[in-house]
Amino acid sequence: MGIFNNIVFLIQKYGILFLTGTGYTLLLSLITVFFGSILGSVLAVLKNNRFLIVRSISTAYIEIVRGTPILLQLYIFKFMLPEAIPGFKPSTFVCILVALILNSAAYVSEVIRSGIEAVDKGQTEVARSLGLSKRQTMFKIVLPQAVRYILPALGNEFIMMIKETSLASVFFVGDLMTQFQTISGATFLTMEPLIIIGIIYFVLTFSLSKGVAVLERRMKAGER
């Protein structure tokens, strides 16, 4: 059979596995970016804390995570997390998810920090001169405007995470590349399932990138 016929055969026989892999990939990415955004917001606040020790710890965490390969982090959490808490034996999926969340948080914190810094400093000064506290200024003036810079960047982080979850296949967590290993082992085909999975990844990331571009244009239009 030719490559095209093999692709048709794989879709017909293993379509459910490709769909399952897509579901797991999206699930991993969504949960990672959601909780990564929450933790990243906390890190961004801590990095601007007035206490040096707090700033130093958050900065060190961000730099260490961003300065080490994500695959290394996945390995560390896969083998460390079950041993770290006595009596708690998380599944491989949970271990990998925690590692991805902590990785994403470091990058999201910088996204949020950049979004906040993009807001005109003059507005902060005006708000403080009108009697608003630093906290009130941040939540009532700065953050509502920073959102238009942050949201598109978070969309790009989600797209990036879809691709990075492919590394989780090393631990067989059900994502697209895990399904590739299953299908390839059952059929002894390599190129054809990779082509199908490549198309799925492209469709996901391309459609999402277009959505992010539309969101970014609308955010910019709202500035006028």
Language model features by range: what are they?
Residues 1-224:
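Transmembrane alpha-helices and adjacent helix-loop boundaries
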